[in-house]
């Protein structure tokens, strides 16, 4: 039997701060290859990715797991109680960067997959698509894996992403979709001048302030069947002006929108640009924008896959998971173009924090859930 706790510790000891591979995928490749998985490194533009398959290529019954081994920076090491790459155990907890997000889940589904195919070889395929580019730009990670799979005729019937999904208690929540995310980068252009002679300048600040105030006051919607209301947040407002007696020539603001399935990035872009044009006309200030879309909203409708995962979670934890679309973006937004996808993982309270830590008992419990999902899927 593969010990997922020991494998978690081994992965934490790999300093895989995005975009560095840090030895994590090489470690997994060696373990999975020894267990009979056909492994392929799908690196792109310096980003490391690993594809592993047990069973027949292109089989109609192919269950996939997706996850990442890259982690966010640790910040100031002096603030940590233990080495962030030491996998130190204290009491019931294992400490380290990536302990929750998400090396424990990668260890759990890798261990579950290896033991499952050894104990009860299924009529089908088990696929692991693991990236080193989820916490970074996410352009050459899961996207690269999916591009490669399509070109090679590799396919998943369904996929489970092992992101931490439970707010407080193991088993309380799974994700069946995610909100979309997009960011507007605005710049208002005026004419610099002395603050004592404002008539000789053209101050862009009031115009941009008017725009972000108008946007911040919008009610985008009241929610949909599976989503909470969309949100809009003003996240930056900058002039880069250190002088208090100079009217700046330009100022910038950033606005982030998390949107549900009542909208698309295209419809929101049109709406926001329309409001910006109105403000520009009212103030006589030119306002430009650049838009970055991290992903559209999506949902895997409740049904076969969510029922499969929920039943396994309830059996192993005694809890019926809530079907949620809350939170930020994940690589499920890419997988959903390939096959139905849901997310289930550990309690995520300490992810990205100093002293990130995982409750050790949850790791074998998660392996048991993933094993049961595989068993029931191939039954």
Swiss-Prot record:
Q: InterPro entries attached here?
A: ArgE/DapE_CS, Bact_exopeptidase_dim_dom, DapE_proteobac, Peptidase_M20, Peptidase_M20_dimer, Peptidase_M20A
Q: Name one GO molecular function term.
A: succinyl-diaminopimelate desuccinylase activity
Tell me one GO biological process term: L-arginine biosynthetic process
Q: Which residues bind Zn(2+) 2?
A: 101, 135, 352
Q: EC number(s) for this protein?
A: 3.5.1.18
Q: List, alphabetically, the CDD domains matched.
A: M20_DapE_proteobac
Q: Name the SUPFAM superfamilies for this protein.
A: Bacterial exopeptidase dimerisation domain, Zn-dependent exopeptidases
Q: Where is the active site?
A: 70, 134
Pathway listed: Amino-acid biosynthesis; L-lysine biosynthesis via DAP pathway; LL-2,6-diaminopimelate from (S)-tetrahydrodipicolinate (succinylase route): step 3/3
**Per the annotation, how and in what number is the cofactor bound?**
Binds 2 Zn(2+) or Co(2+) ions per subunit.
What reaction gets catalysed by this protein? Answer: N-succinyl-(2S,6S)-2,6-diaminopimelate + H2O = (2S,6S)-2,6-diaminopimelate + succinate
PANTHER family per the record?
A: ACETYLORNITHINE DEACETYLASE (PTHR43808), N-ACETYL-L-CITRULLINE DEACETYLASE (PTHR43808:SF31)
Q: Known NCBIfam families for this protein?
A: dapE_proteo (TIGR01246), PRK13009.1 (NF009557)
HAMAP family in UniProt: DapE
In the record, the note on similarity to other proteins reads: Belongs to the peptidase M20A family. DapE subfamily.
Q: What is this protein called?
A: Succinyl-diaminopimelate desuccinylase
* Protein species of origin: Dinoroseobacter shibae (strain DSM 16493 / NCIMB 14021 / DFL 12)
Upper classification of the source organism reads: Bacteria, Pseudomonadati, Pseudomonadota, Alphaproteobacteria, Rhodobacterales
């Amino acid at each position: 039997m593969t010990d997922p706790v020991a494998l978690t510790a081994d992965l934490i000891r790999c300093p895989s701060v995005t975009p560095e591979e840090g030895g994590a995928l090489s470690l997994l490749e060696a373990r999975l290859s020894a267990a009979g998985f056909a492994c392929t490194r799908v690196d792109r533009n310096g980003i490391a990715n690993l594809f592993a398959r047990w069973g027949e290529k292109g089989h109609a019954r192919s269950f996939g797991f997706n996850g990442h081994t890259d982690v966010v920076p640790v910040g100031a090491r002096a603030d940590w109680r233990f080495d962030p790459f030491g996998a130190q155990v204290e009491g019931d907890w294992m400490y380290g960067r990536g302990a929750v997000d998400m090396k424990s889940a990668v260890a759990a589904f890798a261990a579950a997959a290896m033991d499952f195919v050894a104990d009860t070889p299924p009529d089908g395929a088990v696929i692991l698509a693991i990236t080193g580019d989820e916490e970074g730009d996410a352009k050459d990670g899961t996207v690269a894996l999916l591009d490669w799979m399509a070109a090679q005729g590799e396919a998943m019937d369904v996929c489970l992403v092992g992101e931490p999904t439970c707010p407080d208690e193991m088993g309380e929540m799974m994700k069946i979709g995610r909100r979309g995310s997009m960011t507007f980068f605005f710049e208002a252009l005026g004419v610099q001048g002395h603050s004592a002679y404002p008539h000789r300048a053209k101050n862009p600040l009031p115009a941009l302030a008017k725009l972000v105030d108008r946007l911040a006051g919008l009610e985008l919607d009241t929610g949909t069947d599976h989503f909470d209301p969309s949100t809009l947040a003003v996240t930056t407002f900058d002039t880069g002006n250190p002088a208090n007696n100079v009217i700046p020539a330009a100022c910038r603001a950033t606005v982030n929108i998390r949107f549900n399935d009542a909208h698309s990035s295209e419809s929101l872009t049109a709406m926001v640009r329309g409001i910006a044009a109105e403000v520009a006309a009212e103030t006589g200030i030119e306002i430009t924008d650049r838009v970055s879309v991290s992903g559209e909203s999506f949902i895997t409708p409740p049904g076969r896959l969510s029922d499969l995962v929920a039943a396994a979670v309830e059996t192993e934890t005694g809890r019926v998971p809530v079907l949620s679309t809350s939170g930020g973006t994940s690589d499920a937004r890419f997988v959903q173009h390939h096959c139905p996808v849901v997310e289930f993982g550990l309690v995520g309270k300490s992810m990205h924090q100093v002293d990130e830590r995982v409750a050790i008992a949850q790791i074998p419990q998660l392996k048991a859930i993933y094993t049961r999902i595989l068993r029931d899927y191939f039954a």
